[in-house]
């Protein structure tokens, strides 16, 4: 979540360009204006992604069709048939077809410190709808007459196969990969830190994510990734996933 800015409300205004990054993953960029993205294809995450021999996988929209892409060794964006895309012309989608989104509130010690709030002893879990996620370089609408639209740099963990009643030690075997996200919160509407309501966290396109899904076997230690937030090119937050207060879950 929020990293590296002590006791400061991390807000954005209309037109701000917000960039969140995680070393070894890549960037997600967001503009605070409205956007709309169609979807015409539903890949199977357990089969489609397992068959791809690439470190990073993403999804883009080409001629109104969802197309899977990979990143080449020299950083180019390429389709499965070898077409190399110009990144400035790409319309990015979230790197995977969205299923259930589980979120942990106040899951970083720095985030709790920024908000002058004691980190909880147990995870605060809430769900987000599919409508909340939007791709790299897309746009997010800032509601009118609000003061506290907070950016929240996140490491997103992508589960690659069905799991139920597994132990914490087994959990890593179900992780397909990782990506980076900006989980906006409209704190003007917050009634209770323990129960963020729909207007705070479940707005359309309020969570830019991607562009790349980095395979789990490419990340030696996901609890030692550097996270950075930049507003209009200026670094405003910096920290690591070591500050994650809940590194395992049952």
Descriptions of predicted regions:
Residues 1-48, 111, 187-250:
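Catalytic-pocket segment enriched in acidic/His residues
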Residues 19-25, 119-136, 151:
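Structural signature of FAD isoalloxazine-binding scaffolds in flavoprotein oxidoreductases
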Residues 39-123, 217-220, 228:
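N-terminal non-catalytic cap/leader segment that marks the start of a structured domain
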Residues 85-90, 111, 119-120, 134-146, ...:
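Short acidic (Asp/Glu) patches
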Residues 153-155:
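Ligand-binding beta-strand-loop-alpha-helix segment within the catalytic cores
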Residues 164-179:
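N-terminal accessory regions of nucleic-acid-interacting proteins
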């Amino acid at each position: 979540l929020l990293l590296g800015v002590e006791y400061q409300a991390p807000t954005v205004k209309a037109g701000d360009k917000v960039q969140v990054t995680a070393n070894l993953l890549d960037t997600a960029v967001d503009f605070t204006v409205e956007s709309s993205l169609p979807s015409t294809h539903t890949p199977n995450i357990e089969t489609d992604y397992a068959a791809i021999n690439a470190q990073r996988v993403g999804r883009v929209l080409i001629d109104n069709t969802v197309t899977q892409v990979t990143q080449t060794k020299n950083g180019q964006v390429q389709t499965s048939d070898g077409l190399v895309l110009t990144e400035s012309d790409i319309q990015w989608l979230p790197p995977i077809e969205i299923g259930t989104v589980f979120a942990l509130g106040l899951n970083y010690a720095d985030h709790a410190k920024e908000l002058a709030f004691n980190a909880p002893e147990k995870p605060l879990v809430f769900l987000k709808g599919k409508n909340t996620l939007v791709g790299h370089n897309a746009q997010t609408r800032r509601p009118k007459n609000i003061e506290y639209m907070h950016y929240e740099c996140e490491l997103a963990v992508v589960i690659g196969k069905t799991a139920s009643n597994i132990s914490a030690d087994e959990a890593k075997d179900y992780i397909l990969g990782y990506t980076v996200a900006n989980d906006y919160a409209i704190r003007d509407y917050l009634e209770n830190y323990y129960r963020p309501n729909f207007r705070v966290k479940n707005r359309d396109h309020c969570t830019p994510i991607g562009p790349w899904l980095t395979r789990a076997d490419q990340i030696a230690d996901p609890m030692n990734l550097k996270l950075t937030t930049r507003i209009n090119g200026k670094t405003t937050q910096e920290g690591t996933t070591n500050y994650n207060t809940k590194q395992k879950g049952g």
